[in-house]
Amino acid sequence: YTLSLHDALPIYGEGIGIKVCGDMDIDEQFEYRYYTPYFKGSGVTSYADVSVERRIDREAYVGICEDTKVGINLVFYLQNMMEYLRERQLGGRSIKYSSVTLSGLCNEGIILLPVLKSKEQEREQQEDVHNRMLLLSAAKSGDPQAIESLTLDDIDTYSKVSRRLISEDVFTIVDTYIMPYGIECDRYSIMGEILEYRLTRNEITREDICIMKLDVNGLLFDVCVPKREVMGEPAVGRRFKGNVWLQGRINF
């Protein structure tokens, strides 16, 4: 038996709470097995294909999103497990879904200033990202020319970055990034541009919580972090850097 996100108690703030999972015996006595904090994101992060796998250690599931924007498979803790199990029971293996909404729980982070770019540089960067996405899609289909082009692009990028690192800081070269962090498969180190920013309050501890919508390598998702653990002043256009526990829900 699992409490849904709407039933999870207690509710600590806007979209923030604790989900409890456990067993209900014949006397309707609930005994919990584990509980996890959650943070519900907003909007849509990706329309890419998603596969779901059960964790070995407990009754929980992770989603694997294959989005070409980042070039790696993103693994996230599945928030709407009961909804997924219900859809699987009704539809078998042919589960239909529309999109994925990701979110990140973070303990601490740093605010960085944005990289100064001209309109022409922004346009060229968008074109490069679009072309790379097309090449990645073609490479996944087995196109040898696309694979070769990606390899040459990576070599060229490595060479350019190595030269610039002699006189520049890495955070003036890299706008945003997302990469695995630690030994858990759903932990990531991220840096993204702040698109939206607001404050909410933990109703239990009365602590202020920063909620930021980030653009991380073209992926848009919300991150929550305690305000007192953020070094710097968050603002739209600046960048946030931190380590997150990536969660998400599949929109059926």
Describe every region a protein language model picked out.
Residues P10-G182:
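Long, hydrophobic alpha/beta structural blocks
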Residues L195-V223:
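OB-fold (S1/OB) nucleic-acid-binding surfaces
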Residues Y1-T2, D7-L9:
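Short, small-residue-biased leader/transition segments that mark boundaries at the very start
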Residues W245-F252:
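Short, Lys/Arg- and Gly-enriched loop/turn segments at beta-strand edges
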Residues M179, R198-T200, R228:
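Eukaryotic intrinsically disordered and solvent-exposed regulatory patches
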Residues L74-F76, D222-K227:
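Short amphipathic beta-strand/extended segments with alternating polar/hydrophobic composition
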Residues Y181-E193, R238:
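Short coil-to-beta-strand transition motifs
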Residues K227-G242:
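Short nucleic-acid-contacting surface segments enriched for D/E, G, S/T with interspersed K/R
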